[in-house]
Amino acid sequence: MSFSISLSFPDGSQRDFPAEITGLELAESISKSLAKKAIAYSLNGVIRDLLDPLEQSGQVEIITRDDPRALQLIRHSCAHVLAEAVQELFPETQVTIGPVIENGFYYDFARQQPFTLEDLNTIEKKMREIIQRNKFFKKEIWSREKAKKIFSDKGELYKVELIDAIPEDQDLKIYYQGDWFDLCRGPHVPSTGQIGNAFKLMKVAGAYWRGDANNPMLTRIYGTAFSNENALKAYLNMLEEAEKRDHRRLGREMDLFHFQEEGPGMIFWHPKGWKMFQNLVSYMRRRLDEHKYDEVNAPQVLDKSLWETSGHWGWYQENMFKTIPATNDWNDEHVYALKPMNCPGHVQIFKHGLKSYRDLPIRLAEFGLLHRYEPSGSLHGLMRVRSFTQDDAHVFCTDEQLADECLKINDLILSTYADFGFEEIILKLSTRPEKRVGSDELWDHAENIMMSVLKTIEKEAKGRIKTSILQGEGAFYGPKFEYTLKDAIGREWQCGTTQVDFNLPERFEVFYINRDSEKCQPVMIHRAIFGSMERFLGILIENFAGHMPLWLAPQQIVVTTITSEANEYAEKITAKLKASGLSAVSDLRSEKINYKIREHSLQKVPVILVCGKRESETNSVNMRRLGSMNQISLPIDQAIKQLTNEAIPPDLRRFMNS
């Protein structure tokens, strides 16, 4: 057999192998122990079934169970076992789709009677039985006609619809596990036994076919799977902790906000919640001023002609809230929409008046109230809403200023996250997608600048930031940075973005006058730090489990009395606290002190000052911190000084110490 392909390995070595060698044969040629551990291989970055032949030269890696990439294979294969288990137990059920998602997988089923939570235990037991059979995953390529006939004969009409949607030039792959089979792109682990037992079915939910409310309602079963029992246990423990921190529950207990049916995805902010929101806005306003941004405000409602120019009307219209004057109809040219994004408005502000290169960079920021029509099933407290405020900014600069502006934005983003206690940051650079605007030369230039910025950030971060490059994941209008932070229980939240835009300046014919007195198109940078202010507040509530830092807390201090004899003294203390700039209220109710302390603790008030007859006579207070059983007796002036210092926001503290 001739040696016709050359393979490069992670250790830098390179060897020739016979064409059509399988991944398993390749692993066996390296070592028997590796072959036993192997579950798939990667060729030039594409993960493939272990028994697939290698038809071309390139970079190759054998993937074992411990490889992070193995998790997707395990979960994908587990979804297939779930579908087989359901059809063994409930033969009348049609299977539809079963993708891998973040932290697990799901499968959608069509049946007259939806599954119940009680059914999950039965299904999970059957799954373990199927895994124990250790049947091989076997791939076949079928013709379109054969696939449609077989699935039609089985009554799997959703599969027939999926087959019709697959492009003619793509193979139809069918994966068998024993006698059961499914339409699937793959890849999978070699056999059901290699899924292991570290999996669990989590919940049942309803889902419309293809996410369209006009289609039939299906029953979705969610599950998760890991490479080992310890990882599964850690994940389930994290979920248990996350439930305790759920911002929706804490929002009720702390009396921050609520939702109701008349305004789905729209937040009703209560006084305490709105105070916390405004504290966040005030913090960011100071940071914007520090970094030389100009705050602006653009209209909420704009004519569709503007959205047509920006491109939103063509590709985002279904997510926009539209309106017309009472005298008009939908066919009239004067159709309006609530803005889903701030950028077109900021472009109009930049265009108003002639700009010179001497004026650049111009940094326009807005706490813009946006409206986006999200599907009702996707709404989730503050994390996914239909009306939200974005801490949006757009920087208009010259090409020469791009790198420096990206670095300045990075400094602002990282220092902001640090102020809220987020020290573990993941930064991803997303490069050109297949469908994009702009020439290759333009993309080459922008990506080279962003790559240079990334290297500078890595050097200055000194290990604080993990970085990666996502090939082909950029926006159609330019490359972008995405900032992801880790919270107190290890969850990742994508928040900040820095995006270069070639599209809008060209669409709106934006220009400035350069040194040669010629019109020149500026570089436009989209930038957000919190992203959605509401979502970031939800993240903070969960990260701190409601124990907000004193400077951010909506109600910082409660002064409560033991007896009515101390009422006048308590009100005097409250007035002094307010005069010092602190948020304080008096609780003079004739309730037992332990009852009042418990109530305020449930509402997550950071500091409770207890006053009785002795405190009023000694001009002191008993200070109790949230989460602590200890009380400290302090003179009132000392307590106020201590709390006033503690309540200084981190950005102001930096300024005072500089």
Curated annotation (Swiss-Prot):
Catalytic activity: tRNA(Thr) + L-threonine + ATP = L-threonyl-tRNA(Thr) + AMP + diphosphate + H(+)
Family annotation (InterPro entries): aa-tRNA-synt_IIb (IPR002314), aa-tRNA-synth_II (IPR006195), aa-tRNA-synth_II/BPL/LPL (IPR045864), Anticodon-bd (IPR004154), Anticodon-bd_dom_sf (IPR036621), Beta-grasp_dom_sf (IPR012675), TGS (IPR004095), TGS-like (IPR012676)
Binding site for Zn(2+): C343, H394, H526
GO term, biological process aspect, one: threonyl-tRNA aminoacylation
Domain TGS: 1-64
The keyword Aminoacyl-tRNA synthetase is annotated on this UniProt entry: yes
Stretches for region Catalytic: 246-549
EC class: ligase
Alphabetized UniProt keyword annotations: Aminoacyl-tRNA synthetase, ATP-binding, Cytoplasm, Ligase, Metal-binding, Nucleotide-binding, Protein biosynthesis, RNA-binding, tRNA-binding, Zinc
Subcellular location field: Cytoplasm
Gene Ontology cellular component terms for the protein in this record: cytosol
Cofactor note: Binds 1 zinc ion per subunit.
Record-listed E.C. numbers: 6.1.1.3
Principal cellular location given in the protein's record: cytoplasm
PANTHER family, alphabetized: THREONINE--TRNA LIGASE, CHLOROPLASTIC_MITOCHONDRIAL 2 (PTHR11451:SF44), THREONINE-TRNA LIGASE (PTHR11451)
Known role: Catalyzes the attachment of threonine to tRNA(Thr) in a two-step reaction: L-threonine is first activated by ATP to form Thr-AMP and then transferred to the acceptor end of tRNA(Thr). Also edits incorrectly charged L-seryl-tRNA(Thr).
Protein family membership: Belongs to the class-II aminoacyl-tRNA synthetase family.
Name assigned to this protein: Threonine--tRNA ligase
Origin species: Bartonella bacilliformis (strain ATCC 35685 / KC583 / Herrer 020/F12,63)
Gene this protein is translated from: thrS
